[in-house]
């Protein structure tokens, strides 16, 4: 009997509930799509949230700018729950959007030592809490190609420091310069990387 290939898992649905007070108190609002400015919804800031479905990117500023935070399924009772081991004290979350490409079963990322996809390269298909411990000879990455899925890259080993979310459906999956990693990108120092799964 012939084996039928399963259809790809449909993208979405996504659902996130945000609160204007810590510990899921105060005003609340549910979203199933992007929000470029939480102030337009009557909030001055998001102080806690629950991700009920899908993976999301939260941003420090409106219009999807500033420090990025990956928001995966679960509860975030305070700002430090989403910034976690981030080396920077950021209590602000003003915009967010779903990560559409996080739904891929197989994730693949190629990192390059230099900008514009030049120099030694390394193909990743798994999580790496320390690139150097796994054989990458540098603490910097010049450019990256996301061939499938979505990834979060961290400035320091152990998934700490600035977070950069890279997606196969943004920039055509090609990030030829570290400044393309996000509006907050200040360095091409990347020392840990992991896949974003739904």
Curated annotation (Swiss-Prot):
Signal peptide: none annotated. Gene3D superfamilies: Crystallins. The keyword Signal does not apply. Pfam families: Crystall. Residues 14-53, 54-100, 107-148, 149-197 form the Beta/gamma crystallin 'Greek key' domain. One of its GO terms (biological process) is visual perception. The N-terminus is blocked. Homo/heterodimer, or complexes of higher-order. The structure of beta-crystallin oligomers seems to be stabilized through interactions between the N-terminal arms. Has a two-domain beta-structure, folded into four very similar Greek key motifs. Crystallins are the dominant structural components of the vertebrate eye lens. This is Beta-crystallin A1-2. It comes from Aquarana catesbeiana.
């Amino acid at each position: 009997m012939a084996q039928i290939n399963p259809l790809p898992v449909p993208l979405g649905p996504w659902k996130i509930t945000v609160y204007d007070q810590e510990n899921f108190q105060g005003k609340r609002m549910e979203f199933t799509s992007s929000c470029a400015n939480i102030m337009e919804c009557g909030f001055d800031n998001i102080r806690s949230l629950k991700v009920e479905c899908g993976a999301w990117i939260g941003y420090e500023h409106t219009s999807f700018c500033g420090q990025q935070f990956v928001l995966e399924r679960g509860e975030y009772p305070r700002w430090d729950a989403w910034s976690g081991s981030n080396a920077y004290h950021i209590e602000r979350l003003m915009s967010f959007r779903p990560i559409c490409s996080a739904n891929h079963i197989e994730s693949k990322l190629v990192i390059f030592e230099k900008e514009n996809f030049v120099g030694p390269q390394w193909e990743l298909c798994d999580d790496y809490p320390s690139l150097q411990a796994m054989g990458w000879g540098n603490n910097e990455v010049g450019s990256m190609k996301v061939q499938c899925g979505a990834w979060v890259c961290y400035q320091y080993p152990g998934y700490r420091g600035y977070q950069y979310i890279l997606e196969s459906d943004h920039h055509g999956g090609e990030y030829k310069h570290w400044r393309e990693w996000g509006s907050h990108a200040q360095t091409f120092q990347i020392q840990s990387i992991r896949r974003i799964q739904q």
